[in-house]
Amino acid sequence: MLQDLFTPSVQHALDIVGIFVFAISGALLAVRKNFDVFGIAVLAEVTALGGGLFRDLVIGAVPPAAFTDLGYFITPLFAAALVFFLHPEVERTQLAVNVFDAAGLGLFCVAGTTKAYDYGLGLTASAALGLMTAVGGGVLRDIVANEVPSLVRWDRDLYAVPAIVGATMVALCIRYEALTAFTSGLAVVTTFVLRLLALRYHWRAPRAWNRRSTAVEAEAQETP
């Protein structure tokens, strides 16, 4: 299905862009955690390729694309080298990194959903794998770096929700036979914009409601 929407060269270019920006985020975290050069390279690879590897193993697309296309493997290493030598400059362009990361999130959730459907999965499972393609690398990155995955932390701006929206849009388009290059692009843009808005306005998922803490806060506000 994805092959019907974009030429192979366009698909490959979009994959490389997404892999590169995700690798940058992994390499930056490695620098902040004082990893050595090998650790920076490993974290860049894990972040960039983890979600896609998980998807391909689940749907039976073996060997995974990351092992059959040298460009997929080399791109994270290039990103790691860039961060290793120029990380102060890269840190100063964090806004640009966030923008590209949001774009990668949109691209990967759409590509992951369509590829899973192409391999015979149902719409719900395809959307779930689209989500995992988009966020799986980040989860593995945080685990390797010995951190609680930012995906499940309340003090992090929404990340999974934009990907869920994008993957759901693709699944609905498939269901109603409306998946085109335009609607796929719309899903990417929607995911991209939602992620940037979450960063701009610090949108976060709600936590479990605690009656006792709510009552204490209300009492404190009433106390003169």
Task: Give the positions of each predicted feature.
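Intrinsically disordered, low-complexity non-transmembrane regions of multi-pass membrane transporters
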Residues: 1-7, 203-224
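Helix-coil boundary and interhelical linker segments in multi-pass alpha-helical membrane proteins
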Residues: 1-10, 57-67, 111-126, 171-183
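C-terminal ends of transmembrane helices
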Residues: 23-33, 56, 81-94, 139-151, ...
